Structures are given as C-alpha cells and as structure tokens.
Swiss-Prot record:
Belongs to the aldolase class II family. RhaD subfamily. CDD domains: Aldolase_II (cd00398). It comes from Salmonella dublin (strain CT_02021853). This is Rhamnulose-1-phosphate aldolase. Keywords: Cytoplasm, Lyase, Metal-binding, Rhamnose metabolism, Zinc. InterPro entries: Aldolase_class_II_sugar_metab (IPR050197), Aldolase_II/adducin_N (IPR001303), Aldolase_II/adducin_N_sf (IPR036409), Rhamnulose-1-P_Aldolase (IPR013447). Its cofactor is Zn(2+).
Amino acid sequence: MQNITDSWFVQGMIKATSDAWLKGWDERNGGNLTLRLDEADIAPFATNFHEKPRYIALSQPMPLLANTPFIVTGSGKFFRNVQLDPAANLGVVKIDSDGAGYHILWGLTHDAVPTSELPAHFLSHCERIKATHGKDRVIMHCHATNLIALTYVLENNTALITRKLWEGSTECLVVFPDGVGILPWMVPGTDEIGQATAQEMQKHSLVLWPFHGVFGSGPTLDETFGLIDTAEKSAEVLVKIYSMGGMKQTITREELVALGKRFGVTPLASAVALY
C-alpha cells in the first residue's frame, strides 16, 4: 500500500515549508501555502483518506475550481512542524462539484482546518489559472523580512516598488518582468483582502501586503519559492543600500530595456517609464 506521506506533493510541501522556516519568513504560524493537484495525483492514495471526510462550505462559491484537489497548510500551524507531523499540519482537500465547499480527504487531524487565508489563495488560484492558461499551480504567502521593511520606506505603488527591486539585482527583471503588485493595508483572513489580492494576481505573480508579507504564484513549489527568494534577496540589497546612504549609481532604464530584450521578456511598462 502506498503511503501518501511519501508522495511527491507531501514531500514537496515539507521541503517548501521547512525551507521557508529556515529563511526566517514564517515565524510561529505565519505564512501559508497551497498547491493545486490533479485527480491522478491523489487517486493512488485513496486508502489513506479519512473514512468520513469533513465538509466545509466556502464563504463564496468557486465554480472554476469545482472537483479540484489541493494540498494546503493548516490554520494556526507552524511551518517548522510540518516535517515532524505532516498529517497534523497539512491537508488534502477537494472542492465539490459546484464549487460551494470542500471535503478534507486527508490530514488536518484533530479537527484542524485549512489556513485562514484560504479565500485569498483560492481566489488567486482562479485568476492565475486564467492568466497563465492553467500553468500556475502554487500560491505561497510568507513574511519575507526585507520586502516587508521596504513597504515602510518606499512609496507603496507598483511601478516604484517594481523598479527598485529590478535595480536591486540584475536577475529580478528576468524573473518577474510582470512586476510586483501592492495593496493598501487590509485586515488579513477576509474575503476583501482575498479579492484585492486576486485582482492584482491578474497582472502580477508577486503581490505585496504592506507591513505584513508577500504573495507569490508559480507553476511549481520550487519556482514559486525561487520567485519570492529572488525578490527578497533584492529587497535585502536595497535595505543595505538605504542604510549606507542611498544609491550613487544604478541600472539605467536603457539597460533594463536591453536586459528584457536579451532574455525575451516584456518588462512592466509603468516601471520602465518611471524615470
């Protein structure tokens, strides 16, 4: 009998959550992670499923996600503990046929429930499915230290944050040419912040929540982790630059355009045109 804890998706979630904890992005129960699966991924592990899966209604219907399985982190769970007890800290859920709710097929033991940011995740999954023609499968939220710090000292608008992050490290324009969306501060764990995040996810694979954290989307766990890691590295460089008195020189607009041409990407126009 195959054990679901040995599956690629449970092992992938263990690695991603452990790596994020080691990075310092997910203190206590901070952060959440969801991965969209296919029926073929979970079918071999049906014998591991709960005999009577709990059903939880969604706060709003998600018909685009009907019959779709996900693996998710749990509410109030610590990323550092996922590797110690995956079944207590992770769950495989499946949206019902009309998108009105989901069953917890595996994990989330002792009456645990999925992350409180599930509305933001599911709404963002819907938008990224449309934006990437189904390619993106992962939504990751974490408290990346230096990205948060920048939201206190830079004007919180997409063009400026994007441009500064591109300047902080040459690879950034190549990794996220679509730029970084940013919201006003909002109460977390609500449909409102979920809807606002999803709206930005129509245009950007990275979305900042000021004074709180970042949302990232990608086709795989590695790609999504790497996306956030790249932006966070640039933010760290910028924090050091500003602490040393600011930039004396930087990558120019012409150089950013040349970089985009070399790697075949189209940089966010508003960030390129900023200055």
